[in-house]
Every structure is written in C-alpha cells, then in structure tokens.
Amino acid sequence: MGPPSSSGFYVSRAVALLLAGLVAALLLALAVLAALYGHCERVPPSELPGLRDLEAESSPPLRQKPTPTPKPSSARELAVTTTPSNWRPPGPWDQLRLPPWLVPLHYDLELWPQLRPDELPAGSLPFTGRVNITVRCTVATSRLLLHSLFQDCERAEVRGPLSPGTGNATVGRVPVDDVWFALDTEYMVLELSEPLKPGSSYELQLSFSGLVKEDLREGLFLNVYTDQGERRALLASQLEPTFARYVFPCFDEPALKATFNITMIHHPSYVALSNMPKLGQSEKEDVNGSKWTVTTFSTTPHMPTYLVAFVICDYDHVNRTERGKEIRIWARKDAIANGSADFALNITGPIFSFLEDLFNISYSLPKTDIIALPSFDNHAMENWGLMIFDESGLLLEPKDQLTEKKTLISYVVSHEIGHQWFGNLVTMNWWNNIWLNEGFASYFEFEVINYFNPKLPRNEIFFSNILHNILREDHALVTRAVAMKVENFKTSEIQELFDIFTYSKGASMARMLSCFLNEHLFVSALKSYLKTFSYSNAEQDDLWRHFQMAIDDQSTVILPATIKNIMDSWTHQSGFPVITLNVSTGVMKQEPFYLENIKNRTLLTSNDTWIVPILWIKNGTTQPLVWLDQSSKVFPEMQVSDSDHDWVILNLNMTGYYRVNYDKLGWKKLNQQLEKDPKAIPVIHRLQLIDDAFSLSKNNYIEIETALELTKYLAEEDEIIVWHTVLVNLVTRDLVSEVNIYDIYSLLKRYLLKRLNLIWNIYSTIIRENVLALQDDYLALISLEKLFVTACWLGLEDCLQLSKELFAKWVDHPENEIPYPIKDVVLCYGIALGSDKEWDILLNTYTNTTNKEEKIQLAYAMSCSKDPWILNRYMEYAISTSPFTSNETNIIEVVASSEVGRYVAKDFLVNNWQAVSKRYGTQSLINLIYTIGRTVTTDLQIVELQQFFSNMLEEHQRIRVHANLQTIKNENLKNKKLSARIAAWLRRNT
C-alpha cells in the first residue's frame, strides 16, 4: 500500500461504484419528475393567448401597464411574480371541478371598459378591472384555485384572516409567491407562502385586464349598430354558462353563490346597467385628464356568477311600475320613438304578477331592466334584474302584425321571467340538472300565455312549438337523457347541454307531471320546493322529494310508485316509448322507439321500460287514468266491439311523452270515425293520429298505407294546423325532389286537390278580403306557408292566380305589403311565372334594402326563375358584383336547390369553381355536391359526380364526399321504394 497523499479525498472502488449508482438513480428520478411536471401546460399570466393582442393595442388610459418586479417584502404591496417555465405538476388544477377548499361569500367588482362614443371600436377594445373576493376557508391550503380565462393578472393579494365582526379589517396578509394559469381547465392558481386556516375568512384582491370582442357573444362583448342615422356601439355581457371567468376571476360554478357589489366606470354620455338599481355616481379622471363616470349599484342577493350582468349603452327606455317595482324596457332610440318596445312593456308587469301569485313568492329584486340588443346570439338571457334580449325577441314593429312575432315575444318574455324563480331564486346544483331551469321555464311559457289568452288552443300550440320537434329528434341509443348522471363536464360539453332535450323534453316532462297529478298538487309541490331552496341550490331529487311530500299529504291521487321512480324512468333514460294497444284483446305493451325500428337489441340495457301514465278517451269520453308500469299489461276496458261507434285513443291531449300505435283493428276504427264524423275526434287528436301514424310508418312500426288511410277524410278538415301536419309529413322535400323521376306527382295532385278546396277557400278568402283577421291566429300564421306553397306546387289555379295578384300589387305599389306568412311563396312564384323584368325588380329591391331578413327572402326568390340564362346571370352576379359580396347567403347553393337550377349550377361550376371557392369557401363546394347529388340512386351516378368534382377537392375531401354520397344513395333508394308504395296506394284511391 503506498503512502497517503498530503491532500485530497479518496474513496474505495466499491464506494465509487455505489456513488455512481446513486447518481444514476437520482438522474432517473429527475427524469421521471420532469415527465410528471410536464403533464400539463403551466402558463404565466404574461403568456396567455390573446393578451399579446391586448399589449399591442393602446394601453388603457387609466394607468400604465405595470412591469413585473422582484418579489417584495411583506411590508410592500405585492406585485405578482411568475414562474418562467410552462410546466406544472399533476394536481387539483387537472380536475374539471373546483376543489372545495374555499367558499366565496362576496365580490366587490369594478370594471372599466374603454368604450367612447367618439372612438368606435374596430373589433375589440381593452378593459381593466379589480375584484375583491371574500372567501371562507374550509380546508387548510396554500394553493388557491379560481376560474379565469383571457385575462392578464396584474396584481394579487390575499388579506386575512379577517377579524369577525369588523368588516374588512384584517390582522395580516398572506404572501403570494406565484400566480399562474392552467389554460385547459381555465384556472388561475395562486401559490401562497403559508396555508390558509380552516374556518377563517380571507379577501382575495386581484387586478386584471382583458379584451372586449365584437365577434363573440361571450363574456363582455360589443354591438356596433346604426341608430338615428349614426353608427354607435354598446357593451353587454353573456356569462352563462361559464363565461364569467372571461370577465373577472371568480368561482364560476352555479352552486357557489355569493353577493356582489358592482361598479362600472364608463363614458359620461353612456348609461350603465347591472343587476341591481343604481346606488350612486361620481366622477373620475384618467391619466390623460379625460372624465369618466363611476356608477355603483346596490348589493345583489346571493346568486351564481353566471347571472351577473352588465350593459353600457346610449339607449332610451320606456317604463312602468308593477306592484311598486319599476320595469324598464331599453332599446335603440329609433325603436323607442317608434313604439316598438310598448308591447313588451305592457305584458311584462302582468306576467310578473301572475307568477308571483301562482307561487306565492314575490319577485326578489326592487327593479327589472330588459334590454334589446341589435345582435345577441343567445336570443334572450334571464340575468337577475337585467334581462338581455335580441331585438327580434322583444321589439314589435307595425310591420310585424301579420307575423307570429307577437305570440313569440310573449313566449320568450314569459320564459325569461319564469327563470326569475326557476334558475335565479332556486338554481340547479350543477349543469347536469340544467333542465330544472330551462325545462320548467319553458313549460311555464305556455301556462302564462294560456292564462292571458284562454282562447288560444294550448294543446295544439304545445304540439307545434315543442312536441312535434322533440319527438322527431329523441331516439333511444342515439340521444341523451334530460338529466345526466355524469357531473364532470368540460366547458364545451356544458354549452352543448343547452339543446332541444333540455328545453323541449324538459318542458314535456313538466307538462306530463302536471297532467297525471293535477294542477293544484303540481303547483303546491313547486311552491314548497321554491320556498325551501330560495337563494340556494337544488338537485333533481330535491324536486322529487317535494312532489312526494305533496302527494303524501293527500289521498285523491294514487300513484303506482314513488314520484322519484316514476320520473327517473323518464329523465334518466334517453328516447321515449311507443305504446301499442291491441283493441281486440286489451293488451298494451311498451318498447323503446327506435329509428327504423331496428331489430338489433344488443345495445339495450335491462332498464328499458318507463312508468307510463295513460290518459285516454273512448268514444269521445275521457276515461280514468291508468298506468303501464311494466313491459306489457292487459286493460279489458280498452277492448272495442264491432260497433262502428266504438273507438279508443290513448294519450289524452298528447300530455304523455310517447307515440301511440294500435293493432289493425284499432287504426281501422279510428279511420272509420274520421270519415264518418271527424269533429267527434278533438283537433289535438286528429293532429296526433296523423303525426304518430306517419312517424310510425317511417320507422317501420306500421305500413305507410295505414298512415295514408287516415288522410281520406281531409275534404272535411277545416283546421289549418291539422293540414299543416299532414303536408309536413306527406309532401316532404325528398318527395318534391323526386317528382320528375317517379310518377307520383300527378297522382298526388289529383288526390290532394280534391281535398284542399275547403281549407283553401277559407284562407284564400281571408287573404283577399280581410287579411288582418289573421294577426291573432297563431296557428294560421305558422301554417299558412306550407298550405300555400303546396297548393301552388300542385298547380292549384287559384293559388297561382293569387300569387300573381299579390306580386303585381306589390310591384306597382310597394306599400301594398305581401302578407308575411306567404311572402316567400308569392315572391318565388312571382319570379317563376314572370320574366327578366320581374327578376330585375327584385334585384333592385335587394340592392336598396338594408333589412337582413328581406335580403334573405329576395335572394331565395330570385333563384326560383325557370330560365337558365337568368340563373346563370344570377350566379355571375353572386361571385362578382357588389350587391352580393357582403351577403352570407350562398347564392350558388340556393340556385342548385331548385329543380332547374340543379343542372345550371353544375354547369356553372365547371368554369367558375375557383371563383366560387374563393367567394364561399371549399366547404361550399362539398355542400353543392350534396345538393346537386341529392337524387343519386346508383354507384355510377356517384362516380360521375365525383369525377365531375375531382379537380376541385383534396384527397381527404373526396373520401368523405364519397362516403356521404353513398349514404344519400341509400336514403334515395329507400325513398324510391316508399314513393312507389305511395304511388300504388294513390292509384287505388284516386
């Protein structure tokens, strides 16, 4: 062994190997940690998307944008520091729901949008804001999560714990080490140097900035519009469902209710509105010396973030007082001067009073503002105390007297006022139960309007507005349930819940529940529910519990199961049942309603039955309620005899959410009754029989001939809504497009024209002699167009003549307005029966009008020409001349949709496809292929069509187009077989 060295540190070879192993293990661990920390993106505030745009624009004049500073001592005001890297470890920020560590109690919110009347924004404008959020800590944590998106956090402090009973006095401050954003889950994360204490309250103080956009109606947004001949701008908000986080950092979940003190800073020439009445105003100068108005508002009740609302505008208003509370309708100055807001003002107060009396709960806020925006994608929003509408859903102009608009405005206003109880006062706990808001608000639309207009046919209107559409959309296996059991929704999935199932199926559930109980019991349960959960949140089971309490307190209504078991069978299952009654045996069965009555049941769950209330009539007399609470059951009382007067109809007034089928004898008995005395069957059931029969035949439950038999009596039918249902089901777009391929047109013409005389004479006489008589006939207003277009398509001479008369009067004297319900048809046939002279008149009208709706009407009408050269010229104009360059209507698609235009458009595309693609985009070419190819029935036709378009599409587009054309071909082959059967039946019965 050699001598030891005089200096240094030595290890043995074994120790060296051990240390090398430890270093390797450490490096491996670091690699694993790096992979984990890179699990999701971590973004400091300065790198948020969209905020570079903000920095590129002129900074808000109120103060300079602060520059990041080093972490200060606790004695200095904290400026936010950020972690420079974009990684983050796995943690609560990966979850779709906020952790339950903090409960918000109160927000002090100030917003300062830089909107000036002398500098109209070009697409966007900056805003700044401050929010102080008082929270209660429930779990010790040094990481605070709240929602925030599209904002730059400029300052963050946490003060507390707050001393009990001393307001905002604090005993300390919790240093904030870092602020960063989890973009995918839309969180702002505050990293603290020490944990918050459970049971204590704190105040989060945040300053932020962002952008107000014009092109998106989410968060804060802009409308630029024209009023009194000048271009103006306004700012408004839409925070439902998850857009509050776009405006200010917050706890953006519906169950996290809090109170709000709101302050808006705005130009002195504007008025600021929010949920509560104005509390006071003061003046403020920015760094440039410009004066701004500071408007503060009273404290709100406890409410979720999605109901917070702001508007800054230069509007006028009309007002009235209802039970001591002010109601104001705000709109453009022109609209107020024209009286367009008067109708909404006159109905709003009485609707509030009706619902207050019905629920025995007064409206909670001291005022209501309702504002009409020139452009609002959501149509209407129920913000507490500040409801926001699109103009089309609130303003009634003199020219609207012959539209269904008056009734539709009544429904929309009733819906939003209904939300003041269902949604605002009592809010669903989470978005999976949004139907508790929207379904009941939709249902009470009809109850309100029926109360004020008892002569309106309530069942027929509910069918037309709600049932007809939802029953066509809701099919087992391919749709969703009304109430979702899943709670962890992504933001995009939450937005998708605002669909026909939430609104229309939800309303149908409420209506069915009301009918199998009774109105008194139904309202009594709702009163209890609303009172118990006022200013709070509820789940579906809470609602069922209060219904069960009401049922248990009486003995008149006896149910076969608990209300929860009954209603869960409807709200937790997709689709609906088809109920089939054998009138010979009295056997009733249920099965899920499937598209095309699929035979493969392998995807079914064991729970594929409903507890079905059966209200029914026999020989015109209402019978006691029965229940089908299993797959099959015998009801001897529903058997019919051989008597011609013996018949049964299930689903009284269509209050149950299901289709009804009968055995052959049952359908035969109903058909005999229709031919003998149709008025013995109520209008709603004539509607029901037609709609159910055609839907059942389309989906292979019964033969098409069974449905057609029900139309034989139509010569005696004088209810236009029944005719509308027949024509919608029989004269479909597919059938119209096939008239030159199959010999069905001449047969259908002879069959229907023999039966149209009565209904046609009624309404053609009204149109000629007293068209204003239609203004309060809602069912006629929504049905006339289909009657008129079918009569003219069938070549009814008087229809063509009336179209000529109305068109000529309008051309000669434009003040002679064409009745709105048939304006599209009259314009179309005016062009189809005319020459280039009439076409040029429409072009001139199109060029000079600024009304968007009228432009769309005229664009479609000009495509009705039968002259190929006119259609070619039209398409040339569409891609090259100024009248059409700003119009979003795809003129080429419109032309291609017509019988003559299909071939003209195909040839036009050969020479102009690049210009068409540039004007309308590549997707328009794909849409055109489907439009032009909607009659293909062979693979050869598909190949020919694809070869024709091959140079216009990319390879991936060709593959998609081929697959979709195959689907179209299969549909057309099915329609061809159906048309052949219809034609054969018509031959036997014409």
Swiss-Prot record:
Activity-pH dependence: Optimum pH is 7.0.
Tissue specificity as recorded in UniProt: Specifically expressed in placenta and not in other tissues. Mainly found at the cell surface region of the extravillous trophoblasts. Detected on extravillous trophoblasts in the outer layer of the chorion laeve in the fetal membrane Not detected on either fetal amnionic epithelial cells or maternal decidual cells. Also detected in the migrating extravillous trophoblasts in the maternal decidual tissues (at protein level).
Membrane topology recorded in Swiss-Prot or TrEMBL: Single-pass type II membrane protein
Site feature location: Transition state stabilizer: Y503
Record field: transmembrane: 14-34
E.C. no: 3.4.11.-
Side of membrane Lumenal, spans: 35-990
Protein's UniProt keywords contain Metal-binding: yes
UniProt entry tagged with the keyword Protease: yes
Binding site for substrate: E240, H379, A380, M381, E382, N383
Topology Cytoplasmic: residue spans: 2-13
A Pfam family it matches: Peptidase_M1
Cofactor binding description: Binds 1 zinc ion per subunit.
PTM text: N-glycosylated.
Disulfide partners: none
Alphabetized GO MF terms: metalloaminopeptidase activity; peptide binding; zinc ion binding
Compartment(s) of residence: Membrane
Activity regulation info: Inhibited by bestatin.
Cofactor(s) needed for function: Zn(2+)
Active site: E416, Y503
GO biological process, one term: proteolysis
Region (Disordered): 48-91
Function: Metalloprotease which may be important for placentation by regulating biological activity of key peptides at the embryo-maternal interface. On synthetic substrates it shows a marked preference for Leu-4-methylcoumaryl-7-amide (Leu-MCA) over Met-MCA, Arg-LCA and Lys-LCA. Cleaves the N-terminal amino acid of several peptides such as angiotensin-3, kisspeptin-10 and endokinin C.
Protein family per UniProt: Belongs to the peptidase M1 family.
Subunit comment: Homodimer.
Protein name: Aminopeptidase Q
Organism: Homo sapiens (Human)
Gene assigned in the entry: LVRN
